[in-house]
């Protein structure tokens, strides 16, 4: 028994709008995690034997409980300092269940035997779900990103344990109450609370794990997964570029880039964090972008007004500030915003457009995770592609051009798992296409498309011999 089990631990959480440590929770003990996983294993077999339509029906019952729980919405609002995005996170549950049900029907449909290379042998595949899947969620979209892994895992027939981020823990308690309203689901889905130590205990007990977070922590998670000999599906950081060609409309491009850079205060891994614009339209583009950036307002003091919320994690404010200061010290020009603002105890930053940047600056090389938009000009499209690929990240990217054909000709050369053409950040709302994570932006099977569910199965093959006479021992030997 560990010291944690004997004494227990309590963690405090900061309110992003007030800056106050106004919430605390007791960490789930390691022994409790072992008990939870054991209970889930006992319930998983019956869950996996249900049809996918039956599992979807149970999940839809949960969605109704979630949508009617005002305490859950209020807790998520307090966790993130955002009202409209919190509302959207909760609303996404119902549509996500429907989306995965459609995909699941294709996976689970009856398949006839397939002729093998041997004339008398056919085969068919069987999908066996992992018994217990673990999920370690992030703080930027604490409910939504958890759902992206949780729903397909449950639909596949796995039981699931979720550890949300300790930065945004308030929503866990009311969410657990909604699970209790659907006992069948509560038997195969549980939430635990804690920090990195808790995450390690989770990895030690599950059969597969999904992680969303930083590259640094992701590497530790992957190492631990290897030691436990379980698959890890990790989506890590990003430094997404957009290339704007000379034939693009500078005004429309500015609108797209601003939205993709500052939505959710830039606290999204697929936010645009680097802009490469052709020199012939750069001035017009920057003029439009700055004008739009200066029109963005904070949702303070009224959370239901304004465009962007506070910085959820106070340490992220320090990173953003260091990136801006580093750029200024190296000769960059701040065209809008440029500082961390304190309002009511919370930390906020208005859209910060930065010109005269290069790849010696942190703001062009490291993940900023805030509404900071560094703009770099180029003269040759091959130079733009080289710059876009000059990064340790490869999550996603975008190309804005005169038409989609021109954009596609550029996109195929970008080293990233998903490239939006004639838009930015399409993967924030479209999950149909499969993508992998390039470079240090992640590892493991895609969380999108059919593979988003298939990754929770082990594939089994059944071979059937149809020959009337099978080979006996007389067929052996060296004759």
Regions found by a protein language model. Name each.
Residues 1-121:
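N-terminal Rossmann-like NAD(P)+-binding subdomain of aldehyde/semialdehyde dehydrogenases
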């Amino acid at each position: 028994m560990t010291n944690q089990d004997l004494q227990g631990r309590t963690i405090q959480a900061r309110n992003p709008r007030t800056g106050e440590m106004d919430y605390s929770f007791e960490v789930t003990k390691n022994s409790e995690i072992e008990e939870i996983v054991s209970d889930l294993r006992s319930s998983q077999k019956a869950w996996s034997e249900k049809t996918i339509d039956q599992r979807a029906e149970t999940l839809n019952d949960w969605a109704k409980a979630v949508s009617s729980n005002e305490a859950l919405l209020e807790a998520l609002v307090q966790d993130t300092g955002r009202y409209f995005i919190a509302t959207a996170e909760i609303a996404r549950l119902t549509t996500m269940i429907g989306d995965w049900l459609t995909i699941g029907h294709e996976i689970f449909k009856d398949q006839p035997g397939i002729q093998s290379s041997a004339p008398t042998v056919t085969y068919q595949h069987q999908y066996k779900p992992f018994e217990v899947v673990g999920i370690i969620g992030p703080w930027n979209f604490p409910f939504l990103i958890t759902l992206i892994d949780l729903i397909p895992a449950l639909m596949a027939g796995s039981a699931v344990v979720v550890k949300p981020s300790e930065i945004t823990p308030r929503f866990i308690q009311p969410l657990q109450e909604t699970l209790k309203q659907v006992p069948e689901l509560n038997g195969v889905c549980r939430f635990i609370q804690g920090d990195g130590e808790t995450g390690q205990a989770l990895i030690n007990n599950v059969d597969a794990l999904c992680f969303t977070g930083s590259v640094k922590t992701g590497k530790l998670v992957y190492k631990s997964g290897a030691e436990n000999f379980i698959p890890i599906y990790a989506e890590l950081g990003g430094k997404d570029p957009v290339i704007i060609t000379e034939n693009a409309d500078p005004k429309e491009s500015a609108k797209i880039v601003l939205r993709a850079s500052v939505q959710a205060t830039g606290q999204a891994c697929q936010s645009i964090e680097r802009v490469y614009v052709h020199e012939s339209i750069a001035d017009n583009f920057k003029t439009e972008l700055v004008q739009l950036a200066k029109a963005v307002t904070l949702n303070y003091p009224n959370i239901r007004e304004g465009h962007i919320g506070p910085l959820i994690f106070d340490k992220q404010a320090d990173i953003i500030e260091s990136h801006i200061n580093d750029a200024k010290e190296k000769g960059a020009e701040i065209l809008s915003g440029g500082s961390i603002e304190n309002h009511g105890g919370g930390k906020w930053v208005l859209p910060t457009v930065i010109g005269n940047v290069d790849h010696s600056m942190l703001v062009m090389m490291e993940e900023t995770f805030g509404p900071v938009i560094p703009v770099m000009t180029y003269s040759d499209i091959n130079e733009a592609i080289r710059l876009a690929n000059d990064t340790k990240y490869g999550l996603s990217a975008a190309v804005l051009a005169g038409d989609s054909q021109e954009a596609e000709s550029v996109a195929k050369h970008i080293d990233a798992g998903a490239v939006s053409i004639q838009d930015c950040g399409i993967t924030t709302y479209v999950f149909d296409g499969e993508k992998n994570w390039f470079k240090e932006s992640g590892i493991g099977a895609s969380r999108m498309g059919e593979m988003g569910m298939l990754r929770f199965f082990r594939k089994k093959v059944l071979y059937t011999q149809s020959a009337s006479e099978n080979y006996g021992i007389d067929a052996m030997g060296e004759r």
